[in-house]
């Protein structure tokens, strides 16, 4: 039976709408983790498809400066994986939450314990950017009988056969990495990016979402045209931290019609 995240995103796709997933850093709020529910409900009210929630880590190799600094602010607020899990148990939302974490915090907590503790929460997906596909067996057995999907990341340098290998049996969505580099580095897209995304979209049987560097209205239009939707991180994190208006951008993204 398909996992909840797969079903919800497939329903949005079937309705002819673009999927929009904002990223937020857990604990990057003046109230620390006590402000997480407020941020989630703010985004839920704007109609987002799902919400990616980052766990702060001191060595975030895939993150650009905006998200790295957000992680440091969160850690300064005392955020820990244990505290985040306890907070997530208290949050009620109809929007699927997708946890983005490096493997180290997960390993320190214990993968089995992490999955068990989140079983009755809104968490429906897990992204581990520094976990190679060959080591997915460190995590997958613990997710097999749960409603949490392990989300594969597919980079621009991935050939077609490797793409098929990475996405075989995947649930939730495929995270298509739009740039070779860290998050938030916009505008430096390869000339063959659209071709790469179209090819990935053709071989995938679950939604393909484009992330890393997506930050403008033009990006929304471009990537919704060649994939099923977008993930936006740095732009959202920066706006929330600085109190900048972000509602109109999110509303435009949510309202995108294929």
UniProtKB/Swiss-Prot annotation:
Q: In which pathway does it act?
A: Amino-acid biosynthesis; L-tryptophan biosynthesis; L-tryptophan from chorismate: step 5/5
UniProt entry keywords in alphabetical sequence: Amino-acid biosynthesis, Aromatic amino acid biosynthesis, Lyase, Tryptophan biosynthesis
What this protein catalyses is: (1S,2R)-1-C-(indol-3-yl)glycerol 3-phosphate + L-serine = D-glyceraldehyde 3-phosphate + L-tryptophan + H2O
Q: Where is the active site?
A: 52 (proton acceptor), 63 (proton acceptor)
**Pfam families linked:** Trp_syntA
Q: Does the keyword Amino-acid biosynthesis apply?
A: yes
Stated family: Belongs to the TrpA family.
Q: What does this protein do?
A: The alpha subunit is responsible for the aldol cleavage of indoleglycerol phosphate to indole and glyceraldehyde 3-phosphate.
Protein's name in the database: Tryptophan synthase alpha chain
Q: Which organism is it from?
A: Streptococcus pneumoniae (strain Hungary19A-6)
């Amino acid at each position: 039976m398909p996992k909840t995240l797969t079903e919800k995103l497939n329903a949005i796709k079937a309705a002819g709408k673009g999927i929009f997933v904002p990223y937020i850093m857990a604990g990057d709020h003046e109230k620390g983790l006590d402000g997480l529910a407020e941020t989630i409900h703010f985004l839920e009210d704007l109609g987002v498809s799902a919400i990616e929630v980052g766990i702060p880590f001191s060595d975030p190799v895939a993150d650009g400066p905006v998200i790295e600094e957000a992680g440091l602010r969160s850690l300064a607020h005392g955020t820990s994986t244990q505290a985040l899990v306890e907070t997530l148990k208290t949050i009620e939302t109809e929007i699927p939450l997708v946890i983005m974490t490096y493997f180290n915090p997960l390993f320190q907590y214990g993968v089995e314990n992490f999955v068990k503790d989140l079983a009755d929460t809104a968490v429906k997906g897990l992204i581990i950017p520094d976990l190679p596909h060959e080591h997915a067996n460190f995590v997958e057995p613990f997710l097999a009988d749960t409603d949490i999907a392990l989300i594969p990341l597919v980079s621009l340098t991935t050939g077609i056969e490797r793409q098929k290998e990475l996405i075989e049996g995947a649930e939730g969505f495929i995270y298509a990495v739009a740039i070779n580099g860290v998050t938030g580095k916009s505008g430096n897209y390869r000339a063959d990016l659209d071709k790469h995304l179209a090819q990935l979209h053709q071989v995938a049987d679950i939604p393909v979402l484009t992330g890393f560097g997506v930050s403008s209205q033009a990006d929304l239009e471009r990537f919704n045209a060649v994939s099923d939707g977008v993930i936006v991180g740095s732009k959202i994190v920066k706006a929330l931290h600085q109190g900048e208006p972000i509602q109109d951008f999110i509303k435009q993204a949510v309202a995108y019609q294929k």
